[in-house]
Amino acid sequence: MTLEETNNCEIIDELIRQGRSFAMYRNPGEEEPHFLMQTCGEVHLIRKMEDLNGRTGFVIAPFRVTPQCPIILIRPDCHEIPSCAGNLHTPAQGDDAASYGQQFRSDRSLGAKKAYKACFDVFIRALRERTFDKLVLSRRMTVRREPGFSPAAAFYRACRRYIYSYVYLCYTPQTGVWMGSTPEIILSGEKGEWNTVALAGTQSLQNGELPQQWDEKNREEQEYVAAYI
């Protein structure tokens, strides 16, 4: 990492320890990541998608919005990584935010293996009965955090490794730390012209470049997504 990235890692990791709500992301093909942070008050807990209208910020949304699992909106009060995190005041959390954080953490402690097996049984039955052509079942794995692990350093490594993907790192006291990477563009556009991407299949980069040839399996998976859209 560069000296600037190393300094940024120390500050960003400190923001997490202080409980600051922020997001950092790098768009596909860009060199530099974007940063935004809410400097005061609580993040918005939004329980209906329509309530996002007219608002600006970084959105953290579940697949299914419920009163117990709402949409989180980080307000972009600041767009620059602070030069020093030591002088920042840690915002207080209200009862609403605290109760959501407790719900989120308790959900993660459920019997993941048992829940996954139950979901898999439903999925495989639906596929065998031809109710659906394609289903994707995610799973969760808990691992012990290594001493000295830096979420910010992992973000910068992901940016270098996944140059064609959207890479993000975000934190709120309600959700904890989330980091991910995806080549999928759900929606993009402006001035009345909007686009989406039908992306499916799994292939590795070939000599650092996107693959040009797709086999029948991957073409079939892509067609499922295109038909759904």
Map each language-model feature to its residues.
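Short, flexible beta-strand-to-coil junctions
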Residues: 25-32, 61-67, 171-174
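Short, well-ordered strand-loop elements centered on a beta-strand within folded domains, enriched
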Residues: 32-36, 68-76, 89-90, 177-180, ...
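Cytosolic ligand/metal-binding cores
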Residues: 37, 53-56, 65, 185-229
